[in-house]
Each structure stands twice: as structure tokens, then as C-alpha cells.
């Protein structure tokens, strides 16, 4: 769009052109797609992690191959930098898929301090009525000391960054020839990652930096390097004898 063109003109050619001027010329050429009126940004309560790897968001989205075969794309992004850590194509995303791709991602980028996902069964069993205990992904997070955060049901904006990433990804994919196989789709995703992380300025980042620049600009958080204590407030009733029970690590 106009912002991206202005960024490239400034950073690669030393030419300063107002975004409004670029928008006007694109609109005159019929190259601007009208978008629905959105809620003002000020109406949202925004959270942004202070450090890279302080919080990873994950989710998967749906895509169809040229022969209408259904596929699912699993995405991991860094909350602080919007850096796309991993984007992989699968016939179907399962709990085993999530665990495998998470392990590959931490091998490349380190262990995050926390993760944020929705309440899909591939990520958590917390809404399953206590049946079956933790799934493999939850057990892995506990083993690594990673704080797991799940969105409140019916509040999709909690995972808004990865949802917005899906929109950007699909817009790019729609402009490419439709892949005929999972392998072809993965090659397209790899090409998109290079473009998105390293060559595309992000409007939500300071100075419209690229996600790769923001991801490498500060030290990474990890389970042993926490930016807050995550203290929890608990309210209890005092019994008739005036006694209180204190808990440590969930035990009285």
C-alpha cells in the first residue's frame, strides 16, 4: 500500500514522498481497494510485549489448493516484533503437529517466556471438563517453564495480532498462482516469510521497522528472564476459627 511504497522510496532511494500523495496517485489509477470502516484504534485495549520472545501467539487458518483440497496453515508470531517465527502448511493441524512445530521453532529462536493461543483442543484441554488432563503441548510448556495464556472464550481480539497476520498472509497468497500441492504451498509460505519479516515495513512498529529489525533490537525474554512476576490475587473466606491456609506451588 501507500505506506509500504513510501517506506521503500525513503529507505532504498532516499526519496521522501508523502503517503497521502502516493495514495492519491494509486487511487487515480484504480489501484486502491476500498476497505470497510473499522473501529478506531483508540477503542481497543492494546497489549504489546516489552521484549522479543516474551509472548508468542499461535493459531492456524484454512487454505485450499488448486484442486480444492483443504489445508491448514499453522502460524507462530512474536507479540513484541510481529516477527513470523514459523508458518507451516499441513493437511490437518493436530495436537502432535502443534508440539512438533513448537519444538522446531524453539530450536531456531529460543524458548519463549509465554505463549498465547485460543482454546482449541490442539492447544489446551482446559475447557474439556477436566477429562484427560493436559495435552502434549501443555505438558511441554510446563516442562520448559513456559507460561501458558489462553484467550477468553468469545473474545477473538485477544489473539488479534496472529489473526491480523492471517489476513496479511491470505491477501498475499491470493495474489500468487494457486498451489497444487502442500509442498508448493510451503514454498510460497517460505517466500512470504522472507518478504514479511525482512522487506516489509510494519506500521505498528516504531519507525515502521521490519519485524526482523524489531525482533533483533532487544534482548530476548525466556522462562528464566521474566519481565514481571505474574502475581495472582486470591480471595478466601476465613473459617469460624479464624484460620487461613497458605499454598505453595498449588499445595497447602
Language-model features: locations:
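Mobile genetic element proteins and their domesticated derivatives, centered on retroelements
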Residues: 5, 22, 59, 76, ...
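Short, charged, surface-exposed loops that flank catalytic or proteolytic processing sites
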Residues: 1, 59, 174-188
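RNase H-like two-metal-ion nuclease catalytic core shared by retroviral integrases
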Residues: 117-119, 127-171, 185, 190
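C-terminal, beta-rich DNA-binding module of retroviral/retroelements integrases
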Residues: 197-252
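Conserved, non-catalytic sequence blocks in retroelement Pol enzymes and Pol-derived host proteins
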Residues: 14, 48-50, 66, 128-129, ...
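Basic, flexible linker segments flanking DNA-binding modules
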Residues: 1-58, 127-128, 132-138, 210-218
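Mobile-element integrase/transposase regions
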Residues: 15, 27-83, 91, 95-113, ...
Amino acid at each position: 500500500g501507500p505506506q509500504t511504497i513510501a517506506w521503500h522510496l525513503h529507505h532504498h532511494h532516499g526519496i521522501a514522498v508523502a503517503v497521502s500523495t502516493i495514495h492519491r496517485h494509486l487511487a487515480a489509477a484504480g489501484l486502491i481497494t476500498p476497505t470497510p470502516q473499522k473501529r478506531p484504534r483508540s477503542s481497543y485495549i492494546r497489549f504489546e510485549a516489552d521484549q522479543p520472545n516474551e509472548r508468542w501467539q499461535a493459531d492456524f487458518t484454512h487454505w485450499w489448493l488448486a484442486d480444492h483440497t483443504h489445508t491448514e496453515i499453522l502460524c507462530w508470531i512474536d507479540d513484541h516484533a510481529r516477527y513470523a517465527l514459523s508458518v507451516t502448511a499441513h493437511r490437518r493441524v493436530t495436537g502432535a503437529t502443534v508440539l512438533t512445530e513448537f519444538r522446531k521453532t524453539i530450536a531456531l529462536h529460543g524458548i519463549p517466556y509465554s505463549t498465547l493461543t485460543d482454546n482449541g483442543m490442539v492447544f489446551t484441554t482446559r475447557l474439556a471438563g477436566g477429562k484427560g488432563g493436559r495435552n502434549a503441548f501443555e505438558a511441554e510448556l510446563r516442562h520448559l517453564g513456559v507460561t501458558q495464556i489462553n484467550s477468553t472464550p468469545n473474545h477473538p481480539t485477544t489473539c488479534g495480532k496472529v489473526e491480523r497476520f492471517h489476513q496479511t498472509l491470505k491477501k498475499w497468497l491470493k495474489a500468487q498462482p494457486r498451489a497444487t500441492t502442500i509442498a508448493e504451498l510451503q514454498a510460497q509460505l517460505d517466500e512470504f516469510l522472507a518478504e514479511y519479516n525482512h522487506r516489509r515495513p510494519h506500521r505498528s512498529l516504531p519507525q515502521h521497522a521490519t519485524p526482523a529489525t524489531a525482533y533483533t533490537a532487544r534482548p530476548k525474554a525466556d522462562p528464566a528472564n521474566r519481565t514481571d512476576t505474574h502475581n495472582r490475587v486470591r480471595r478466601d473466606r476465613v473459617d469460624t476459627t479464624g484460620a487461613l491456609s497458605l499454598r505453595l506451588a498449588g499445595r497447602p
